Amino acid sequence: MKTATRKADSARASAAKKRAAPKAAAKKPARMYRTNLRDVPKVGGLKRRDGWVDMQVQFLIDKKSAGADHVVGWTVLKPGARHENHRHHNCDEFFIVLKGKGHIYTENGEQPSSEGDVVYSPRTCWHGFNNTSNEDVVLVWGWMGAGSIEASGYEVDPATH
């Protein structure tokens, strides 16, 4: 009788193990990513028809370089350069004006912007920047929730073209 009970207990224990949720696969350890502006190539192929007018853009951190699900970028806008009104369907954007001044495009028209301004634009909100000064404008910016321009859902405002 004891043998039959042991066999039944063993069978129940074996079935319970099979029903138990499998252990989560071990995640790769996180790795820090570091780069330098001098080492990151400028983005080529940015087209005026897509709202990129005379801009120097670098993707410092993104999916391709760091496996990130966001982008951190650096942009220099020469006098007269602008990033036309645009929006992102799949991510939020922020930018910080490190140097220079110009105008921010908003859903309510243009507003002046200068060194030290920090701007946040939630997904689908139209925004842009125009360098109206005689000096370079330098921006640090980021897309939160998309690791590439393709993933961001970028759309230029057809009304500006």
Q: Where are the predicted features?
A:
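A short, N-terminal "cap"/entry segment at the start of jelly-roll beta-barrel domains
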Residues: 2-69, 84, 153-161
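A short hydrophobic beta-strand segment most commonly corresponding to one strand
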Residues: 74-75, 120, 135-152
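Well-ordered beta-strand scaffold positions
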Residues: 75, 101, 109-111
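Short beta-strand His + acidic residue motifs that chelate non-heme Fe in jelly-roll/DSBH
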Residues: 84-86, 104-105, 121, 127-133
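A generic "binding-loop/recognition-motif" signal
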Residues: 90, 109, 125-126, 135, ...
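Glycine- and acidic-residue-biased ligand/ion/polar-headgroup-sensing regions
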Residues: 90-92, 96-102
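Short acidic-glycine-tyrosine-enriched beta hairpin
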Residues: 108-123
